[in-house]
Every structure is written in C-alpha cells, then in structure tokens.
C-alpha cells in the first residue's frame, strides 16, 4: 500500500487517485512559476523530481484543520502558482542544502512554502525555520496529513529525525 489508509482517504477527497496524471496542468503551472524573476535575479528552474510530483499532484488541495499526531493539521495546496514569489528564498535555502529547489505550493494561509529538491525530498519553509517533511513526496504528504512533527533543518543544512 502506497499510503496509510487514512492518508489515502484524505488525498482521494482532495481529488487525487492512484495513477492520476495531469501533465497539461503541471506544464502550465511550471511555465507560470518559471516566468517570475525575483528582484535579485533568482528564477525557479524545474527539474525531473518537481515535474514528476506536479504531474501527479498539481491541483490537489487538502482542506483539513484539527489535531494531528503531534501538530495541528493545516490545509495545504499542491499549487506552485501560490508560491511564485519565492525564487530568492528557495535559491538561498538551496545553497544551504547544496541542491536546487522548486515550489510545490503552500501550507495554511501562506503560513509555509512547500518545496521539493532535485532528490525528491520535500521541505516546508515558514517564519520559524525550515522543516524536512520527507525524503519523497509520499512521505511529506503523510507528514502533512497526519500532523506528524517533522525535523527542523539546522543552519548547516542537516537534520536529525524528529523526537
């Protein structure tokens, strides 16, 4: 089973299904995001891990609010057009990690930026810090939907498993 049953149920309610592919939507949102140039000249550049994630999950909006395993479960959207002006922020965090990042969407009401790196790892960036949501999108979605506490990324770009 790809996702725990409760996670899969939430994703299905949000419009996802096993085998879902929306390449036209993914291409459109990638074009929109890549058209933006930050004041410092930073731009979003797609890569295969981002393209794969968006081909399957672009346009999935999870409407949830309530207690989770460790944290409150917040709504989130896999829609990078909601995080267009994040090129400079993601470029700076990417330099810390030593990889490129691409926006996936947002958590809450623009409370956090969701981003994927070239290796497929997913992160949340909010005013309190950066968080490793999972080594792949499936793990990150499970973290977000269950309200599991993710590990915080240290200033040197490393993290330890959450307590």
Task: Mark where each language-model region is.
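A surface-exposed partner-binding patch
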Residues: 1-111, 158-163
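Compact, glycine/acidic-enriched structural inserts
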Residues: 129-158
């Amino acid at each position: 089973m790809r996702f725990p049953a409760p996670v899969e149920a939430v994703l299905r309610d949000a419009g996802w299904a096993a085998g879902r592919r929306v390449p036209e939507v993914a291409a459109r949102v990638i074009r929109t995001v890549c058209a933006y140039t930050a004041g410092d000249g930073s731009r979003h550049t797609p890569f295969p891990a981002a393209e794969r994630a968006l081909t399957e999950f672009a346009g999935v909006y999870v409407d949830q609010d309530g207690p989770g395993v460790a944290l409150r479960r917040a709504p989130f959207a896999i829609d990078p057009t909601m995080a267009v002006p994040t090129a400079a922020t993601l470029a700076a965090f990417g330099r810390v990690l030593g990889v490129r990042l691409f926006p996936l969407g947002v958590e809450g009401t623009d409370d956090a930026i969701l981003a994927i790196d070239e290796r497929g790892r997913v992160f949340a960036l909010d005013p309190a810090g950066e968080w490793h949501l999972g080594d792949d999108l499936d793990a990150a979605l499970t973290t977000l939907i269950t309200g599991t506490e993710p590990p915080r990324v240290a200033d040197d770009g490393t993290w330890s498993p959450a307590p």
